[in-house]
């Protein structure tokens, strides 16, 4: 730690760090708390910030007040991002749960997003296995396993073959 940063109050250093973290991408409140609590890598190795629990709470409150931290915005952007990468609703729900987002907030955002999961599942299957999709049972099982791993629901996967004539 340099002499100038060691004289700055812990709250100011935490606030700077929070703004830098949130400037890169949106984070959930739990993610931000975890990153703020982690030691900072300095020239001489990891450095701890001597901050109190009150300092952390003040920083989190400041970030909420000034719009830097918003879990509902984070959830909406996360769902959009992960669905563009080809992940299904089950996987997205699990990842949001790991990031500390409540089940209610996740379900609300999933209802509000306008994503056709069946069409996305079909796109992922055709991207990986080609068009037309195989109708042989053993190949269907491979596709089903792949899509389940990606987080798609069984009903969406079954709709791919149900709507095969489309």
Swiss-Prot record:
Coiled coil: none annotated. The keyword Nucleotide-binding does not apply. GO terms for biological process: regulation of DNA repair. Its main location: cytoplasm. Transmembrane segments: none annotated. One of its GO terms (cellular component) is cytoplasm. It is found in: Cytoplasm. Keywords: Cytoplasm. InterPro entries: RecX_HTH_1st (IPR053926), RecX_HTH_2nd (IPR053924), RecX_HTH_3rd (IPR053925), Regulatory_RecX (IPR003783), WH-like_DNA-bd_sf (IPR036388). Signal peptide: none annotated. PANTHER family: REGULATORY PROTEIN RECX FAMILY PROTEIN. Modulates RecA activity. Belongs to the RecX family. This is Regulatory protein RecX. It comes from Shigella boydii serotype 18 (strain CDC 3083-94 / BS512).
């Amino acid at each position: 730690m340099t002499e100038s940063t060691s004289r700055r109050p812990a709250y100011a250093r935490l606030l700077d760090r929070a703004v830098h973290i949130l400037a890169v991408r949106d984070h959930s409140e739990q993610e931000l708390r975890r990153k703020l609590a982690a030691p900072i890598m300095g020239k001489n190795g990891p450095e701890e910030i001597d901050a109190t629990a009150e300092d952390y709470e003040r920083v989190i409150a400041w970030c909420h007040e000034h719009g830097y931290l918003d879990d509902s915005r984070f959830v909406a952007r996360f769902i959009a991002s992960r669905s563009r990468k080809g992940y299904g609703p089950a996987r997205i729900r699990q990842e949001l749960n790991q990031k500390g987002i409540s089940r209610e907030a996740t379900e609300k955002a999933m209802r509000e997003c306008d994503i056709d999961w069946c069409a996305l599942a079909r796109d992922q299957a055709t991207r990986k296995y080609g068009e037309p999709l195989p109708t042989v049972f053993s190949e269907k099982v491979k596709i089903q396993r792949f899509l389940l791993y990606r987080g798609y629901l069984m009903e969406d996967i079954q709709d791919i073959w149900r709507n095969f004539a489309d």
